[in-house]
Amino acid sequence: MANLNKRPDWIKVKAPNSTEYYNTKDLIKNLRLNTVCEEAACPNIGECWSKKHTTVMILGSVCTRACRFCNVKTGRPDLLDPYEPQRLAEAVQKLNLKHVVITSVDRDDLEDGGASHFAECISEIRKSSPNTTIEILTPDFLRKEGAAEIIANAKPDVFNHNVETVPSLYKTIRPGARYYNSLSLLHNIKKLSPEIFTKSGMMVGLGEEINEVVQVIDDLREAKVDFLTIGQYLQPTKNHAEVAKYVTPEEFKYLERVAKTKGFLMVSANPLTRSSYHADEDFQKLKENYQQKLVS
């Protein structure tokens, strides 16, 4: 039996040490912003921050959910910061970002789940950096009536919501969420604003069967999702769900081939794929693929 405590060579990444990495880190700290890169212990942080790519996490640093895969703190959430949208817009301007990714903790305590705060952040960035494209990675807004409409009206360039895993693992891995609610949210955003690119992702290596992954791929395409990401689950701490398997690069290539036959505009499937990894480059490819589809 393989030693799952030792990561295979294809998972290993270099420790961050570039000047650009530390400059990005200092700016984020000075503007009192949270990032999912740090909170979720992302393995790609060194590469991304060295390129001044970061995923800002709004609505505080404490989540109202306790998903078994996630390293973000859970508990009593922070008070909503009304000045966060302006500070975020300032960071985007100072980093001269062409593409920004905004995510958040779950805020089940808020009436709209934080949807209006996302909208304010989008609005502030549009004011100071009108040429910057905006991608948002949101919670599921479970039982938050009107949240999808708020998001759709804010017109992000990309709307991302991750289904995270296969339905059979929701009770143990993502107990506060509902798989079909996530599918419905993705479908509703596309129906409300067809021009918004939709995106979703999942982790593998949690104990799912390959046929379950293929079914999720089918479900996401049925929900009109444009861009699919699939990456390897990595255990953040010993208190989180254990890795059941390290999926090989060859297996990821197989999943990518399967997904590409379903009609997605883009598919990214490899061990280090994360929702916002190479998001700026992928957005350009997404637009190009859409234009090619129109003329084909």
UniProtKB/Swiss-Prot annotation:
It is an enzyme of class 2 (transferase). It is found in: Cytoplasm. SUPFAM superfamilies: Radical SAM enzymes (SSF102114). Its cofactor is [4Fe-4S] cluster. InterPro entries: Aldolase_TIM (IPR013785), Elp3/MiaA/NifB-like_rSAM (IPR006638), LIAS_N (IPR031691), Lipoyl_synth (IPR003698), rSAM (IPR007197). Residues 49-265 form the Radical SAM core domain. Keywords: 4Fe-4S, Cytoplasm, Iron, Iron-sulfur, Metal-binding, S-adenosyl-L-methionine, Transferase. Its main location: cytoplasm. Binds 2 [4Fe-4S] clusters per subunit. One cluster is coordinated with 3 cysteines and an exchangeable S-adenosyl-L-methionine. Its EC number is 2.8.1.8. It catalyses: [[Fe-S] cluster scaffold protein carrying a second [4Fe-4S](2+) cluster] + N(6)-octanoyl-L-lysyl-[protein] + 2 oxidized [2Fe-2S]-[ferredoxin] + 2 S-adenosyl-L-methionine + 4 H(+) = [[Fe-S] cluster scaffold protein] + N(6)-[(R)-dihydrolipoyl]-L-lysyl-[protein] + 4 Fe(3+) + 2 hydrogen sulfide + 2 5'-deoxyadenosine + 2 L-methionine + 2 reduced [2Fe-2S]-[ferredoxin]. GO terms for cellular component: cytoplasm. PANTHER family: LIPOYL SYNTHASE, LIPOYL SYNTHASE, MITOCHONDRIAL. This is Lipoyl synthase. It comes from Rickettsia peacockii (strain Rustic). The gene is lipA.
